[in-house]
Amino acid sequence: MMEAVHFGAGNIGRGFIGETLAANGFKINFVDVNETIINALNQRGEYTITLAAPGEKKIHVDNVDGLNNAKDPEAVVKAIAQADLVTTAIGPKILPIIAPLIAQGLQARDAANNHQALDVIACENMIGGSQSLKKSVYEHLDDAGKTFADTYVGFPNAAVDRIVPQQKHDDPLAVSVEDFKEWVVDESQMKNKDLKLKTVDYVPDLEPYIERKLFSVNTGHATTAYTGKYLGYTTIGDAIKDPKVFNQAKGALAETRSLLLSEFKNFDEKDLENYQNRVLQRFQNPYISDDISRVARTPIRKLGYDERFIRPIRELKERGLNYSVLMDTVGMMFHYVEPNDAEAVKLQAMLKDQPLVDVIKEVTGLKDAGLIDEVEASVKSKDR
């Protein structure tokens, strides 16, 4: 039986990546610091996924165990040394933290003369996740280790898409996910091209798919969340029923669609519109009760220069295309208040202590004076 090491035993790890690996016949070693989940995985060796869709179908996942990387890093190194595949779903900020452990695992492979090609795939909500992880891993390898990794280890970037809502269960391993899923891997960066997973798409150029997902799902979801919060809603399901929120999301996606069509000639306009309409339908799924606080969390990161709003705004402006709905949404983001979100608290503190223009420059990284003025006007237009 093939073995996978998967970093991140959270809802996405178990409810999406784990499901896919299990369906492809892998034994899965989940790596996490959450003792409750790791212990439950080891005690039971299985868990159940519920699809948030009519019929609420159950999917059984077995041949799983858990490794606590804080308490037993040696076991993780040993698992990587003999793994057929390594994946992550832990969040972009945690990738550099697991890099030393992956580096040790690769060194252990080298020491064991394991020359089987290995791919390390970061399944994160970011552009270039695997290559970013590679950079961090290589910081912990000596020249011989880098040579080994260059020869036998691939870090193919991936785009992943599945809504896994905030949820609470008595069973720590139970997880509910939407029935839609998409996992796309950049085949050109793979080392083990013989290992292809069913239900995963392999493409020669990932960029169009990553941008399509980022500027449709991520931009659309965040637009729904920040507009909904501004209008007083607490869940995505309730917010999107309001025509103001729905039209804001639809308008934002129309703007990002014009950008995608101008940037990538392989997209068909009707197909892209259908894809984005499906995205909006997913947000309306009555089986998913997603809190706005989850979707809108980390507003400072989401206002970043290369993130889901500022980047399309910049690129639309460069092309002379409309970005008014995106800009309007950015104005609402600066008014996002959520006491349990450290970044939201920090953003409001910055706005209280510094001139608005300085905060805009710091948070968005914008240098374009015209765009900075537009953001300022948008924020002020949302004052109450």
From Swiss-Prot:
<dbReference type="InterPro" id="IPR000669">
    <property type="entry name" value="Mannitol_DH"/>
</dbReference>
<dbReference type="Pfam" id="PF08125">
    <property type="entry name" value="Mannitol_dh_C"/>
</dbReference>
<dbReference type="InterPro" id="IPR023027">
    <property type="entry name" value="Mannitol_DH_CS"/>
</dbReference>
<dbReference type="InterPro" id="IPR008927">
    <property type="entry name" value="6-PGluconate_DH-like_C_sf"/>
</dbReference>
<comment type="similarity">
    <text>Belongs to the mannitol dehydrogenase family.</text>
</comment>
<dbReference type="GO" id="GO:0005829">
    <property type="term" value="C:cytosol"/>
</dbReference>
<keyword id="KW-0520">NAD</keyword>
<dbReference type="InterPro" id="IPR023028">
    <property type="entry name" value="Mannitol_1_phos_5_DH"/>
</dbReference>
<dbReference type="InterPro" id="IPR013131">
    <property type="entry name" value="Mannitol_DH_N"/>
</dbReference>
<feature type="binding site">
    <location>
        <begin position="4"/>
        <end position="15"/>
    </location>
    <ligand>
        <name>NAD(+)</name>
    </ligand>
</feature>
<dbReference type="GO" id="GO:0008926">
    <property type="term" value="F:mannitol-1-phosphate 5-dehydrogenase activity"/>
</dbReference>
<dbReference type="InterPro" id="IPR036291">
    <property type="entry name" value="NAD(P)-bd_dom_sf"/>
</dbReference>
<dbReference type="Pfam" id="PF01232">
    <property type="entry name" value="Mannitol_dh"/>
</dbReference>
<dbReference type="GO" id="GO:0019592">
    <property type="term" value="P:mannitol catabolic process"/>
</dbReference>
<dbReference type="InterPro" id="IPR013118">
    <property type="entry name" value="Mannitol_DH_C"/>
</dbReference>
<protein>
    <recommendedName>
        <fullName>Mannitol-1-phosphate 5-dehydrogenase</fullName>
        <ecNumber>1.1.1.17</ecNumber>
    </recommendedName>
</protein>
<keyword id="KW-0560">Oxidoreductase</keyword>
<dbReference type="InterPro" id="IPR013328">
    <property type="entry name" value="6PGD_dom2"/>
</dbReference>
